[in-house]
């Protein structure tokens, strides 16, 4: 390239430090890099933005995948990539996003902490329904455009704070997303270990080579159960497995302890799973005779004859072929009964959740991790399984994930899916304050999480 042209191009390239004020406003940190809450220096608007600085120099395959997809995908419930900055001096990459003040990881944590403080505050029924509907709407859009998210978990479900998009769900962290319209090889051959353990579908744990959109639906079912109970439904001891083998005994054991062991008639193709022989060697069906989703949810006061439970059953169907689709789920009777889903998940009432706090440069995001994990494992008494400690966000609470190549997606013949219209309900009374909860720096928008958790559960770190 001509030297003079390079100099001219460099002088004209916009620099993130010239456009945005973000010093001292770090809200997330992890192996992927750093995330800052930022404002425009020129004062053209008063909006908050999220600046994600990618760790290292150049662009990783994961970052390339995320950028390629986000440049093509446009939907109210999928996070918007506004701009990409390339720093010529230090070869750093910056991604500019809309700023979301909340995420489901912190929202659920808030309600779990209220239970621990003996002042339980349940997530309002209408809020749970609105959250689920918008998650399904965003995933339906991705699936209609041939994209699997593959890493759905509460940390990657953002919720906008005060502003024009108040209470709007944003699905974030497309770093593990993949196109599935015409893969050159089965997806499992490229990277068999995907999705955070607790939200991983049973067919993944059994080594399925041709997994489908159903893996995202299972993860949504896990999130739905967590919204209803304030506890992760399939929490399990987390091991740092240095292998690409997707089989995970303890995670399967936890699923069977909740759901029961699948009958042959309920999942006929289970015998075709690569790890079926290992499954039959490690497990005995009669061990889980008294286990069922009905019994588990009844313990959390979710009635088996409720429409919410019926939808949960369809989302958490063991057989991926029989599992409901996002489009079918959005048409479920659950969403037709009062309270109806709203575009503002807070339904116009006061937002009780604290805003994110800034991290200091010296303050580690994983502060107190080991101590917390040891305490939790010491107190463990759930079906013989422990609880995972925080993993760095690059590993997303599971074995290392292989990076794979991806190209920008093509839209379906009808173009991009349009957003759904939401019915708006009248504002409800403000949420009661559950009293003091754990105080810690807030992580943000799929960014790296802090480690001090309410009792029982150390959760995954998260990224934008």
From Swiss-Prot:
CDD domains: STKc_CDK8
Annotated positions binding ATP: 27-35, 52
Function: Component of the Mediator complex, a coactivator involved in regulated gene transcription of nearly all RNA polymerase II-dependent genes. Mediator functions as a bridge to convey information from gene-specific regulatory proteins to the basal RNA polymerase II transcription machinery. Mediator is recruited to promoters by direct interactions with regulatory proteins and serves as a scaffold for the assembly of a functional pre-initiation complex with RNA polymerase II and the general transcription factors.
EC number: 2.7.11.22, 2.7.11.23
Composition skew (Low complexity), residue ranges: 373-391
One Pfam family from the record: Pkinase
Recorded family membership: Belongs to the protein kinase superfamily. CMGC Ser/Thr protein kinase family. CDC2/CDKX subfamily.
Swiss-Prot/TrEMBL catalytic activity: L-seryl-[protein] + ATP = O-phospho-L-seryl-[protein] + ADP + H(+); L-threonyl-[protein] + ATP = O-phospho-L-threonyl-[protein] + ADP + H(+); [DNA-directed RNA polymerase] + ATP = phospho-[DNA-directed RNA polymerase] + ADP + H(+)
Cofactor: Mg(2+)
Name used for this protein in its record: Cyclin-dependent kinase 8
Record region (Disordered): 358-464
Compartments (UniProt record): Nucleus
Record GO biological process: negative regulation of triglyceride metabolic process; positive regulation of transcription by RNA polymerase II; protein ubiquitination
Subunit and interaction comment: Component of the Mediator complex, which is composed of MED1, MED4, MED6, MED7, MED8, MED9, MED10, MED11, MED12, MED13, MED13L, MED14, MED15, MED16, MED17, MED18, MED19, MED20, MED21, MED22, MED23, MED24, MED25, MED26, MED27, MED29, MED30, MED31, CCNC, CDK8 and CDC2L6/CDK11. The MED12, MED13, CCNC and CDK8 subunits form a distinct module termed the CDK8 module. Mediator containing the CDK8 module is less active than Mediator lacking this module in supporting transcriptional activation.
Lineage: Eukaryota, Metazoa, Chordata, Craniata, Vertebrata
Molecular-function GO term, any one: protein serine kinase activity
GO annotations of cellular component type: CKM complex; mediator complex; nucleolus; nucleoplasm; nucleus; protein-containing complex; ubiquitin ligase complex
InterPro entries: CDK, Kinase-like_dom_sf, Prot_kinase_dom, Protein_kinase_ATP_BS, Ser/Thr_kinase_AS
Interaction with CCNC as annotated region, ranges: 1-15
SUPFAM superfamilies in UniProt: Protein kinase-like (PK-like)
Enzyme class: transferase
Keywords: Activator, ATP-binding, Kinase, Nucleotide-binding, Nucleus, Repressor, Serine/threonine-protein kinase, Transcription, Transcription regulation, Transferase
Biased composition (Polar residues): 409-426, 436-464
């Amino acid at each position: 390239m001509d030297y003079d042209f390079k100099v001219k191009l460099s002088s004209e390239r916009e620099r993130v430090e010239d456009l945005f004020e973000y010093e001292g406003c770090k809200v997330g940190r992890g192996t992927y890099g750093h995330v800052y809450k930022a404002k425009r220096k020129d004062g053209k608007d008063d909006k908050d933005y999220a600046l994600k600085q990618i760790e290292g120099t150049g662009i990783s395959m994961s970052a390339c995948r995320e950028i390629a997809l986000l440049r093509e995908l446009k939907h109210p419930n999928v996070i918007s990539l506004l701009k990409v900055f390339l720093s010529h001096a230090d070869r750093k990459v910056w991604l500019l996003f809309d700023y979301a003040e909340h995420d489901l990881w912190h929202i659920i944590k808030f309600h779990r902490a209220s239970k621990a403080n003996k002042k339980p505050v349940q997530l309002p029924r209408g809020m749970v329904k609105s959250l689920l509907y918008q998650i399904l709407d965003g995933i339906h859009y991705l699936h209609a455009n041939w994209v699997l998210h593959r890493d759905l978990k509460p940390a990657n479900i953002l919720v906008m704070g005060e502003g024009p998009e108040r209470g709007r769900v944003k699905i974030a962290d497309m770093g593990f997303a993949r196109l599935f319209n015409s893969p050159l090889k089965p997806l499992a051959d490229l990277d068999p270990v995907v999705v955070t353990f607790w939200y991983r579908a049973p067919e993944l744990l059994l080594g399925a080579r041709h997994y489908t959109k159903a893996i995202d639906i299972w993860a949504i079912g896990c999130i739905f159960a967590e919204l209803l109970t304030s506890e992760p439904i399939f929490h399990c001891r987390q091991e740092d497995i240095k292998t690409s083998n997707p089989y995970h005994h303890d995670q399967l054991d936890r699923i069977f302890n909740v759901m029961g062991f699948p009958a042959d008639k309920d999942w006929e193709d289970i015998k075709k799973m690569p790890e079926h022989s290992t499954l039959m060697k490690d497990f005995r069906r009669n061990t889980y005779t008294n286990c069922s989703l009905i019994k588990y949810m009844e313990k959390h006061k979710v009635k088996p004859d409720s429409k919410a439970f019926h939808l949960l059953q369809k989302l958490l169907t063991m057989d991926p072929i029989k599992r409901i689709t996002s489009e079918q789920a959005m048409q479920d009777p659950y969403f037709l009964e009062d309270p109806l889903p709203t575009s503002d998940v807070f339904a116009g009432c006061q937002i009780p959740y604290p805003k994110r706090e800034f991290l200091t440069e010296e303050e580690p995001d994983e502060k107190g991790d080991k101590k917390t994990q040891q305490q939790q494992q010491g107190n463990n008494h759930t079906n013989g399984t422990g609880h995972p400690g925080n993993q760095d966000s690059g590993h997303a609470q599971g074995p290392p994930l292989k990076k794979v190549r991806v190209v920008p997606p093509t839209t379906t013949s009808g173009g991009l899916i349009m957003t759904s219209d939401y019915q708006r309900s009248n504002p409800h009374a403000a949420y009661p304050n559950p009293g003091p909860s754990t105080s810690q720096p807030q992580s943000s928008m799929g960014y790296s999480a802090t480690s001090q958790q309410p009792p029982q559960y150390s959760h995954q770190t998260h990224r934008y």
